[in-house]
């Protein structure tokens, strides 16, 4: 690693030393020596020493069941500590001093100034800026909350140690705390013993909001204002809302039978309780601060004559928040509320108005410094979080709505809705939506499945407008899918319009998105209720699983482009909602690059994007890291709108069409076309064993008896990441590029790399995947776990992978992967030394596990789970 990363090197070394000290203390010298020997063999094996490689295999293959857990834990915990050090590096003083990121807001405003950008245009674009992060509980977070808390404290210690003026005594105190935290982590079980409930997942999300985003959002808004003021010459409005937080936790019932209407209601109550708790803490501190006596005449007229007018207002709010806390505490405990709704705070404006009045009065009386202190932070929090802490999305699969309406139509004698043509469905739905009479008979008893759908709609009807952000329909295929949800919401008595969002996920559905939305927009009733606003969700994970990375990404691009053009033509304001994950197979890419690779004008109404599983912690888990993440998102959105990427040339489109067809055929030829593929996949990866790891509340399969097509995209990608073949992220992509180059179109491919962010980002993502893949390790899985007659599949895939790596290197004119990002290459090289033993241990453990699955040694099962979480930590992005 370069000199710039000396702090990172030193921190990793120190954390490793403290971990060794902990292991020696807890397990004894013999275990520590065994671990150290494995580490040295792994390092030498990576350096090309064949004898060391064989010795590594022999050592790990002969390890006793008794010793296997501490060995697995040692390498897993070191990788977690490396992640902490790397996360800290991005926010360290050294990093800040060494480079002002070219992707930051401040650098963007410098470029805008250099290019004489219109102040008016910049002002309009900044005022429209919207970053809406949707937190999801997808089961890719393999680290327990108990450990996450300790990891945050370790990060704080690293921050303190970076101060160069520490005395030896002060340094020793911090290092002792660091050692203790590492020891606490070692003696904490890293594997959950029970699968979290949806309510547990929601509490995890709210804890992250409280511990990180509550501090980060006001700080980011201050930085945004300061940076914009340098360019604009004036402050942004206090009421600006450039950040919004939404959540799927407690609302996403797609394939998760444990998310019920009752769970949704409980999570909504808990969110309001937590918001009241956090605002009460803020308001109590504010009551101490606002001891000023002077206020404006308007303020005095509105709130009365008081010696300390601001305190009077703030104390009233404190009383209301205390009552709010009690009210929702009673609801959560199933007690009759002790206070009435008239005594509590239910809407943002009940908090905003009196506090904004305080703010304006303080400004008017020359107390700007005080107004811009804690009070401004609270106003920013009201704008972003509101009194519900976050908005909730409801998500359900399209056929569940079809089945519910079909049950109704059968009962009332209209026939089976599910069997009707699309035209007949639409005609029926539009007729019922326009009718004033109810469709559902009062005393009807539906099936439990339909009752659950109706109960969910009733919970929505009980909420005030704005609490539910939208209703997302997964696997949306037709205009009737959207109209059906509107009808169910109408029948439940929802008194206002809720955005109903189709999620287009498969290749065919993405290609049909424009046609489906055109049909919807042609429905007069529909145009009348949407108020010329439409949200559409683009699915990244299922489309990549369906067609491969290259074909899926081009389908996503084309769908977005078509929807932008369609809505512009009709005067409809379009928000694109991106369902991305952390991995390449699920649309993951560095945030800035990913956003600048979107079609022109697709971000003009802001960004709505899912933040999933482990990526929430990596990108938002610490206040300073979250501020950096918001800065990158804001800078990319503003750049995409003010300095838009080029429209792709016709010849580039033609090449992408060819790449898409070729890559999809190759991908599906393997995944769907080879009868041996499913048994090979099940043997060569820990896919079946993954279901034993209690990561999230949602089952891994939509249909427990199905094949790959029934497997959720997340475990599909997670499994391939474990055996280092990383297949979903590259299969078909490199081979299609190679075919196009062999057709004599290499010059066009090179121009696309140099001049088109969409294409260059795809190549960069492939390079990152290739640098984390490992054909030798993948071969070990095959040789120990796969029947010989299936070995040909692994051999063919590894040959394709090696050929694809050479193809990508020919585009970058480099001899090594990641040559242009040496510190990432160094980071991967360092991780490999610790991840390789975990992979080889996993092979050994899977072999032992599968030999006698009915009588598995508990130590073997526990160690296997540890290797899964350890490899996830080593790879950084799991699913």
Curated annotation (Swiss-Prot):
Species: Haemophilus influenzae (strain PittEE)
Source superkingdom: Bacteria
Annotated function: Forms oxaloacetate, a four-carbon dicarboxylic acid source for the tricarboxylic acid cycle.
Gene Ontology terms: cellular component: cytosol
Protein name according to UniProt: Phosphoenolpyruvate carboxylase
Cofactor(s), names only, from the UniProt record: Mg(2+)
Family to which the UniProt record says this protein belongs: Belongs to the PEPCase type 1 family.
SUPFAM superfamilies assigned to the protein according to its UniProt record, in alphabetical order: Phosphoenolpyruvate/pyruvate domain
Entries under InterPro entries matching the protein: PEP_COase, PEP_COase_bac/pln-type, PEP_COase_Lys_AS, PEPCASE_His_AS, Pyrv/PenolPyrv_kinase-like_dom
Keyword line: Carbon dioxide fixation, Lyase, Magnesium
């Amino acid at each position: 690693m370069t000199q710039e990363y000396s702090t990172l090197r030193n921190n990793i070394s120190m954390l490793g030393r403290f971990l060794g000290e902990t292991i020696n203390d807890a397990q004894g010298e013999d275990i520590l020596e065994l671990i150290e020997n494995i580490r040295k063999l792994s390092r030498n094996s990576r350096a090309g020493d064949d004898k060391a490689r064989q010795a590594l295999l022999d050592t790990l293959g002969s390890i006793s069941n008794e010793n296997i857990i501490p060995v697995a834990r040692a390498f897993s915990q070191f990788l977690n500590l490396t992640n902490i050090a790397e996360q800290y590096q991005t926010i360290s003083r050294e990093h800040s001093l060494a480079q002002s990121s070219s992707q930051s807001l401040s650098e963007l405003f410098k470029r805008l100034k250099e290019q004489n950008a219109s102040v008016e245009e910049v002002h309009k674009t900044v005022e429209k800026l919207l970053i809406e992060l949707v937190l999801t509980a997808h089961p890719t977070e393999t680290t327990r909350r108990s450990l996450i808390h300790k990891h945050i404290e370790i990060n704080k210690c690293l921050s303190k140690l970076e101060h160069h003026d520490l005395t030896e005594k002060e340094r020793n105190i911090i290092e002792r705390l660091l050692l203790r935290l590492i020891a606490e982590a070692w003696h904490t079980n890293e594997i959950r013993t029970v699968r979290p409930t949806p309510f547990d997942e929601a509490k995890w999300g709210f804890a992250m909001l409280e511990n990180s985003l509550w501090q980060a959002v006001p700080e980011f808004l201050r930085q945004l204002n300061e940076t914009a003021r340098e360019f604009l010459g004036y402050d942004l409005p206090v009421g600006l809302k450039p950040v919004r937080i939404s959540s799927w936790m407690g609302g996403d019932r797609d394939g998760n039978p444990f998310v019920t209407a009752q769970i949704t209601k409980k999570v909504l109550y808990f969110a309001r309780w937590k918001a009241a708790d956090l605002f009460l803490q803020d308001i109590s501190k504010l009551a101490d601060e606002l001891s000023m006596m002077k206020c404006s005449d308007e303020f005095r007229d509105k709130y009365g004559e008081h010696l300390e007018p601001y305190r009077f207002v703030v104390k009233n709010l404190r009383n209301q928040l205390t009552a709010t806390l009690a009210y929702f505490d009673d609801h959560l405990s199933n007690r009759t509320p002790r206070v009435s709704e008239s005594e509590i705070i239910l809407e943002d404006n009940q908090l905003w108005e009196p506090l904004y009045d305080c703010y304006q009065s303080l400004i008017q009386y020359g107390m700007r410094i005080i107004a811009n202190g804690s009070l401004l932070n609270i106003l920013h929090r009201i704008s972003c979080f509101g009194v519900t802490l976050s908005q909730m999305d409801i998500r359900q699969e399209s056929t569940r709505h079809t089945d519910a309406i079909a049950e109704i139509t059968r009962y009332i004698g209209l026939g089976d809705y599910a069997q009707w043509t699309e035209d007949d469905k639409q005609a029926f739905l539009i007729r019922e939506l326009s009718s004033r009479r109810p469709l559902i008979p009062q005393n009807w008893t539906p099936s439990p499945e339909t009752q659950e759908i109706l109960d969910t709609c009733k919970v929505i009807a009980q909420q005030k407008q704005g609490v539910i952000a939208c209703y997302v329909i997964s696997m949306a295929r037709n205009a009737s899918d959207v109209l059906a949800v509107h009808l169910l919401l109408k029948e439940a008595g929802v008194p206002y319009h809720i955005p109903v969002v189709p999620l287009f996920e498969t290749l065919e559905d993405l290609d049909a998105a424009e046609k489906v939305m055109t049909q919807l927009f042609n429905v007069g009733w529909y145009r009348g209720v949407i108020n010329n606003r439409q949200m559409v969700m683009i699915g990244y994970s299922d489309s990549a699983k369906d067609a491969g990375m290259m074909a899926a990404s081009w389908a996503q691009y084309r769908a977005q482009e078509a929807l932008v053009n369609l809505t512009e033509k009709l005067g409809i304001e379009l928000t694109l909602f991106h369902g991305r994950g952390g991995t390449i197979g699920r649309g993951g890419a560095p945030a800035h690059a990913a956003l600048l690779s979107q079609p022109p004008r697709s971000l003009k109404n802001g960004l709505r994007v899912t933040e999933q599983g482990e990526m929430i912690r990596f990108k938002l888990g610490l206040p300073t890291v979250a501020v950096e993440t918001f800065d990158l998102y804001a800078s990319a959105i503003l750049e995409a709108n003010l300095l838009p990427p080029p429209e792709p040339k016709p010849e580039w489109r033609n090449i992408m069409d060819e790449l898409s067809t070729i890559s999809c055929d190759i991908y599906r030829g393997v995944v769907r076309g080879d009868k041996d593929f499913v048994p090979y996949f099940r043997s060569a990866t820990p896919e079946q064993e993954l279901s034993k790891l209690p990561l999230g509340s949602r089952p891994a399969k939509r249909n427990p008896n199905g094949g790959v097509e029934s497997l959720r995209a997340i475990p599909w990608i997670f499994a391939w990441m474990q055996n280092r073949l990383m297949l979903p992220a590259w299969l078909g992509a490199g081979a299609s590029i190679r075919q196009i180059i062999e057709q004599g179109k290499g010059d066009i491919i090179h121009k696309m790399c140099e001049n088109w962010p969409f294409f260059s980002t795809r190549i960069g993502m492939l390079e990152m995947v290739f640098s984390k893949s490992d054909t030798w390790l993948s071969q070990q899985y095959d040789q120990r776990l796969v029947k010989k007659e299936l070995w040909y599949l692994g051999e063919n895939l590894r040959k394709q992978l090696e050929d694809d790596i050479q193809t990508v290197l020919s585009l970058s004119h480099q001899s090594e992967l990641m040559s242009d990002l040496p510190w990432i290459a160094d980071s991967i090289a360092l991780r490999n030394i610790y991840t390789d033993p975990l992979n080889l241990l996993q092979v050994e453990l899977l072999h032992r596990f599968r030999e006698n699955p009915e009588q598995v040694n508990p130590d073997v099962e526990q160690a296997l789970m540890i290797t899964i979480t350890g490899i996830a930590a080593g790879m950084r992005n799991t699913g």
